[in-house]
């Protein structure tokens, strides 16, 4: 069993039950899934860029991403409906906990001038979104093989009903929020 999942069952669940006065263990919020999305703007003119992004996301997440396609045509961006413009991967279960552990303990501390993640990035429904400016913070990415520095969005979907519950859940998991 994963280190974080064990911590969730043994420490976090009882702590959240006492703090929010839950009557049942099933009421305790948990992390449902983590979605990693990267937009590849230059995929329109350069199809190799998308292949590189897919390769990097595969290394970071440990599973093959889905290529996302344009919903609408936008002439200003020289974009046709159905053109590939990005990649996303959804992690659940074991891989989700492993990725979250790696994100909190290894990757985020490698960000330059890191003072913690914003407390304001909750969506009002208990989900947390985090933007990463460069993929180099992940240990799997080899600096010499990177063709272009790409950012990504990491969305942590929880079963929490409010932002306060979700913030407490992520804090217990070790998410470094700003003071």
From Swiss-Prot:
Keywords: Ribonucleoprotein, Ribosomal protein, RNA-binding, rRNA-binding, tRNA-binding
UniProt-recorded Gene Ontology molecular function terms: rRNA binding; structural constituent of ribosome; tRNA binding
Gene Ontology, cellular component aspect: ribonucleoprotein complex; ribosome
Keyword Cell inner membrane: no
SUPFAM superfamilies for this protein: RL5-like
PROSITE patterns hit by this protein: RIBOSOMAL_L5 (PS00358)
Biological processes annotated in GO: translation
Pfam families linked: Ribosomal_L5 (PF00281), Ribosomal_L5_C (PF00673)
Superkingdom of origin: Bacteria
Subunit structure: Part of the 50S ribosomal subunit; part of the 5S rRNA/L5/L18/L25 subcomplex. Contacts the 5S rRNA and the P site tRNA. Forms a bridge to the 30S subunit in the 70S ribosome.
Protein family per UniProt: Belongs to the universal ribosomal protein uL5 family.
Function: This is one of the proteins that bind and probably mediate the attachment of the 5S RNA into the large ribosomal subunit, where it forms part of the central protuberance. In the 70S ribosome it contacts protein S13 of the 30S subunit (bridge B1b), connecting the 2 subunits; this bridge is implicated in subunit movement. Contacts the P site tRNA; the 5S rRNA and some of its associated proteins might help stabilize positioning of ribosome-bound tRNAs.
Protein name (record): Large ribosomal subunit protein uL5
């Amino acid at each position: 069993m994963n280190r974080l999942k064990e911590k969730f069952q043994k420490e976090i669940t009882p702590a959240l039950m006492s703090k929010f006065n839950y009557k049942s263990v099933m009421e305790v919020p948990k992390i449902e899934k983590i979605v990693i999305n990267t937009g590849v703007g230059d995929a329109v003119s350069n199809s190799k860029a998308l292949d590189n992004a897919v390769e990097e996301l595969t290394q970071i997440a440990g599973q093959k991403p889905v290529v996302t396609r344009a919903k609408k045509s936008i002439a200003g961006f020289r974009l046709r409906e159905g053109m590939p413009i990005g990649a996303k991967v959804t992690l659940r279960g074991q891989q989700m906990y492993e990725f979250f552990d790696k994100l909190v303990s290894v990757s985020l501390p490698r960000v330059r001038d890191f003072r913690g993640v914003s407390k304001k990035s909750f969506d009002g429904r208990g989900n947390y979104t985090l933007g990463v400016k460069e993929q180099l913070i992940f240990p799997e990415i080899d600096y010499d093989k990177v063709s272009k520095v790409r950012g990504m969005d990491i969305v942590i979907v929880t079963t929490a009903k409010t932002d306060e519950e979700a913030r407490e859940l992520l804090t217990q998991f070790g998410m470094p929020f700003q003071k």
